[in-house]
Amino acid sequence: MRFLLLSVCALILSAASCKEDNAEPEIPVIERRFTLPEIDLSNWKVTLPVPRSDGKPLEVEPPEILDYATDDTLLPFMYNDSTDGSLVFYAYPESSTTNSSYSRTELREQMEPGSNNANWTFGQGGNMKGTLSVPEISSDSDGDRHRTIIMQIHGRLTNEQRDLIQEDDNNAPPILKIYWQDGRIRVKTKVLKDLNASDTEILRTSAWEDDEGRYFSEVVGTEQFTLEVIVSAGRLEVKMNDSESFVYDGIHMEKWGVFENYFKAGNYLQTSDANAFARVKYYDLDISHD
């Protein structure tokens, strides 16, 4: 019996040894903790802190922007971070845009890909929602951290409005600017300087000014947070983390209804200090219109 057991054991060990000798080497399984961001860029163009030959900042529109992950021009400023599943927007002072002295790596909504001419009004409504963080940002000479704009709603004149007030371009003020500022989120909107201004006068940028601004109570620091912007006729709402909300629905929003608008998102660094920089990470970003 002892001989039989030893023989059986020998056969088992021999078979196991043959299996190990002949088997293909095992490929280690690497668990992917994060997937790359699924952000649809089909209706966005991006402005980069890179000057063109005419001095204006470089812009990349659809469909070229869809290749950002392999585009040598875009890669330094807009790239995937597979360690946390984000789309990174990197900016530093280099090339400013019209009506601003600051640089940006910022998305601009295009309802018709490749064109700035199709936009929306408050009456038509819109929604933008994103989850993001600001993990890195520089400080000034006093040690205070710089700030950056992470979301906007920008106004735009129609061609008829532009011609009516004899402007050279279609630019109108941003009705909404959302800042990351010293670890907190600050919201600023525009208000009319004169509520009795005529329908023609309110088309001018000079007719509007910033309100005092409001901070959400939560301190986000460098951690992730979610922002949602909800627009309807005469009303603007900004929500953070589905727990706190600012609503603007007074006369200023009613008057704003004359403008066209478009959403913006990314990293609009609010300084021209040498060696300044910021990285903003978006984990998701969605826009929709009724």
Name the predicted role of every residue range.
Residues 15-31:
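Bacterial Sec-dependent N-terminal signal peptides
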Residues 1-4:
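Positively charged n-region of N-terminal signal peptides that target proteins for export
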Residues 69-73, 78-195:
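Secretory/extracellular carbohydrate-interaction modules
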Residues 189-226:
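Short, aromatic/His-centered strand-loop micro-motif at the edge of beta-sheets
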Residues 239-244:
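Short strand-turn-strand beta-turns centered on an Asx-Gly dipeptide
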Residues 33-41, 46, 50, 125-127, ...:
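Ligand-recognition surfaces built from glycine- and aromatic
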Residues 128-130, 223-232, 236-238:
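Short tryptophan-centered beta-strand motifs in secreted/extracellular beta-sheet-rich domains
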Residues 6-14:
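Bacterial N-terminal signal peptides
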